[in-house]
């Protein structure tokens, strides 16, 4: 699931 910033959603 993508985080608020979206950088975690990449992994």
Swiss-Prot record:
GO CC, alphabetical: extracellular region
Alphabetical UniProt keywords: Neuropeptide, Secreted
UniProt-annotated location(s): Secreted
GO terms for biological process, alphabetical: neuropeptide signaling pathway
Tissue expression summary: Expressed in the antennal lobe (at protein level).
Protein name stated in the entry: Tachykinin-related peptide 6
Lineage: Eukaryota, Metazoa, Ecdysozoa, Arthropoda, Hexapoda
């Amino acid at each position: 699931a993508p985080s608020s910033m979206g950088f975690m959603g990449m992994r």
